[in-house]
Amino acid sequence: MTETRGARATEAFFGRRKGKPLRERQAAHLENLLPELKIDLEHAAPADLKELFPVSVERVRLEIGFGGGEHLIHRAAEDPATGFIGVEPFVNSMAKLLGQIEAKAIRNIRLHDDDATQVLDWLPAASVDQIDLLYPDPWPKRKHWKRRFVSEVNLDRFARILRPGGVFCFASDIDSYINWTLIHCRDHAAFEWTAAGAADWLAPFAGWPSTRYEAKARREGRSSAYLSFRRS
């Protein structure tokens, strides 16, 4: 436990953040629906994470920082056999996703509305099949690069919770962050970049739904990279 606290002491903490005022229905979703879907970190995680879900699932996938929720809701709807855990501290984004979950009657999503490292440290070892980190905050200034979510400490966390053969997927339109992630994963013994050629990282992931972040990057003339790393 001391080791975990020490690691966290060097990390930037991202708590609940709020933007523009919520609509009445969005506020109601946060008050009534979120408590039903939120994972309870006060109790130990079940040895089998499939027990977190009210429906039968065959595998578990974690998305860190789901933003507008387009990707998470699309994946959950197209793949009901997978249980999804979505983490997002931004209140407005969480409220938006909750509305989509209700509208589409999605039952294979559980949520956390605070720091993702709390979830990473809570999850059992070798319990997750895939981790998605898509268009994370790039912290573009060099002096802030240490705040990027991809770090040796967090890759250790990923390696602990991913099953052997599990996948870490990363997408970004910021060249310095793409290179940063490639270097960090190359230097980590637990991860192997799966790309065999340029098409493997320039083309979106299979079944990828376009997101507003990706669309913004294209409008501003930036191309994206889609990196996959296999847990050894």
Curated annotation (Swiss-Prot):
Its EC number is 2.1.1.33. InterPro entries: SAM-dependent_MTases_sf, tRNA_(Gua-N-7)_MeTrfase_Trmb, tRNA_methyltr_TrmB_bact. PROSITE patterns: SAM_MT_TRMB. Pathway: tRNA modification; N(7)-methylguanine-tRNA biosynthesis. Transmembrane segments: none annotated. S-adenosyl-L-methionine binds at residues 63, 88, 115, 137. One of its GO terms (cellular component) is tRNA methyltransferase complex. Keywords: Methyltransferase, S-adenosyl-L-methionine, Transferase, tRNA processing. It is an enzyme of class 2 (transferase). It holds the Pfam family Methyltransf_4. Substrate binds at residues 141, 173, 211-214. SUPFAM superfamilies: S-adenosyl-L-methionine-dependent methyltransferases (SSF53335). The active site is at residue 137. GO terms for molecular function: tRNA (guanine(46)-N7)-methyltransferase activity. It catalyses: guanosine(46) in tRNA + S-adenosyl-L-methionine = N(7)-methylguanosine(46) in tRNA + S-adenosyl-L-homocysteine. Catalyzes the formation of N(7)-methylguanine at position 46 (m7G46) in tRNA. Belongs to the class I-like SAM-binding methyltransferase superfamily. TrmB family. This is tRNA (guanine-N(7)-)-methyltransferase. It comes from Sinorhizobium medicae (strain WSM419) (Ensifer medicae). The gene is trmB.
